[in-house]
């Protein structure tokens, strides 16, 4: 059975907002799902979810506004990467049906 190593990083302090992301890393089995939480210490309008695959630059997955559906970038779909944004300080990204191609660094950022 193939295991996938994921590094999950938050972009520390941005414009005086402190971001924490959990879990900080995880190893997942093929076919499983992983939910990543992003918590901000102040209310923010927009949250962004990124992925960085080995040897590649950061790629924006989606932008999440509180109270509305996330806006996905080309190549990313809600079925694979569902995002929740229940309030102005919290968001989750789920990576569904994990495969070797999902081995990446995932991170959130705010504006």
From Swiss-Prot:
Keywords: Adaptive immunity, Cell membrane, Disulfide bond, Glycoprotein, Immunity, Immunoglobulin domain, Membrane, Receptor, Signal, T cell receptor. It is found in: Cell membrane. Residues 17-111 form the Ig-like domain. The keyword Cell membrane applies. It comes from the Eukaryota. InterPro entries: Ig-like_dom, Ig-like_dom_sf, Ig-like_fold, Ig_V-set, TCR_beta_variable. GO terms for biological process: adaptive immune response; cell surface receptor signaling pathway. One of its GO terms (cellular component) is T cell receptor complex. Residues 1-16 form the signal peptide. Disulfide bonds join 38-108. Glycans are attached at residue 87. V region of the variable domain of T cell receptor (TR) beta chain that participates in the antigen recognition. Alpha-beta T cell receptors are antigen specific receptors which are essential to the immune response and are present on the cell surface of T lymphocytes. Recognize peptide-major histocompatibility (MH) (pMH) complexes that are displayed by antigen presenting cells (APC), a prerequisite for efficient T cell adaptive immunity against pathogens. Alpha-beta TR is a heterodimer composed of an alpha and beta chain; disulfide-linked. The alpha-beta TR is associated with the transmembrane signaling CD3 coreceptor proteins to form the TR-CD3 (TcR or TCR). The assembly of alpha-beta TR heterodimers with CD3 occurs in the endoplasmic reticulum where a single alpha-beta TR heterodimer associates with one CD3D-CD3E heterodimer, one CD3G-CD3E heterodimer and one CD247 homodimer forming a stable octameric structure. CD3D-CD3E and CD3G-CD3E heterodimers preferentially associate with TR alpha and TR beta chains, respectively. PANTHER family: T CELL RECEPTOR BETA VARIABLE 29-1, T-CELL RECEPTOR BETA CHAIN. This is T cell receptor beta variable 29-1. The gene is TRBV29-1.
């Amino acid at each position: 059975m193939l295991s996938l190593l994921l590094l999950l990083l938050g972009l520390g302090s941005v414009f005086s907002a402190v971001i924490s992301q959990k879990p900080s890393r995880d190893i997942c089995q093929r076919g499983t799902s992983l939910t990543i939480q992003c918590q901000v210490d102040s209310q923010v309008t927009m949250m962004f979810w990124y992925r960085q695959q080995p040897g590649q630059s950061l790629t924006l997955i989606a932008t999440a506004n509180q109270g509305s559906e996330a806006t996905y970038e080309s190549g990313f779909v809600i079925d694979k990467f569902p995002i929740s944004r229940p309030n102005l300080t919290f968001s989750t990204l789920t990576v569904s049906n994990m495969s070797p191609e999902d081995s990446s660094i995932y991170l959130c950022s705010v504006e």
